[in-house]
C-alpha cells in the first residue's frame, strides 16, 4: 500500500445521499480501521485540501456506469482537480467520462487524468482521439477474467494491436523507413 511505502494518504468518500452500496460500505469500514490513512466522509459542505504539484490525486469518484454529465458539487470537484498542478491517476475511467459516446457530455466536468488504470479491457472512449485529453496515458490491468467469460461477451469491436499488425505484415520497421535515408 501507499502508506507502507511512506506516502501520506488522505481518502475522501463523497456521500451526500447517506446511502452506500454494500461494497462501498465494506471498503469504508476497512478504511476506518487503517491507522495510517486519513479518512473523511463528505455528506455536506466540503472544503477541498490545497493541491500542489507534488500531490497525486487518485480519482475513483465515478466509474464506468456513468450515463449523464456530472453536475453540482461533483462537477465543481472535477474542475478543482483539473485546475490544480497535481498528478491525476484515474481508476478504471476518468470520472465524468462516459465509456463510449461523449458527444452529449460536458467536457468541463470530466477529470483530465495523466494516467488511467483500467480493468480487463480498454473502454471504447480511450481509443477515440477526442478523449485523449481526459484519459492521458492508459494501462490495462489484468484482473484474470476467465477466457470463457471473455469469449461469451458480445461485442461489435475488435482491438487491433501492433502485434496483430506485425503478424500480418512481418516487415521490419527499418525496411519500412529505408526510403528516408
Sequence positions of predicted segments:
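YjeF_N-associated NAD(P)HX repair module
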Residues: 54-177
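A cross-family phosphate/adenosyl-ligand binding-site feature
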Residues: 1-56, 67-72
Amino acid at each position: 500500500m501507499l502508506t507502507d511505502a511512506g506516502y501520506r494518504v488522505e481518502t475522501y468518500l463523497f456521500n451526500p445521499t447517506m446511502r452506500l452500496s454494500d461494497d462501498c460500505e465494506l471498503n469504508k469500514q476497512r478504511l476506518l480501521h487503517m491507522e495510517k490513512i486519513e479518512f473523511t466522509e463528505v455528506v455536506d459542505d466540503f472544503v477541498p485540501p490545497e493541491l500542489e504539484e507534488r500531490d497525486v490525486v487518485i480519482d475513483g469518484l465515478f466509474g464506468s456506469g456513468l450515463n449523464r454529465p456530472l453536475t453540482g458539487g461533483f462537477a465543481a470537484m472535477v474542475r478543482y482537480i483539473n485546475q490544480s498542478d497535481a498528478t491525476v491517476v484515474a481508476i478504471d475511467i476518468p470520472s465524468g467520462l462516459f465509456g463510449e459516446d461523449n458527444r452529449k457530455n460536458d467536457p468541463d466536468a470530466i477529470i483530465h487524468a495523466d494516467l488511467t488504470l483500467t480493468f480487463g479491457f480498454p473502454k471504447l472512449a480511450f481509443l477515440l482521439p477526442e478523449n485523449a485529453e481526459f484519459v492521458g496515458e492508459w494501462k490495462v490491468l489484468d484482473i484474470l477474467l476467465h477466457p470463457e467469460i471473455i469469449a461469451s461477451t458480445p461485442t461489435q469491436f475488435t482491438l487491433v494491436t501492433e502485434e496483430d499488425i506485425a503478424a500480418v505484415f512481418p516487415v521490419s520497421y527499418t525496411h519500412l523507413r529505408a526510403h528516408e535515408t
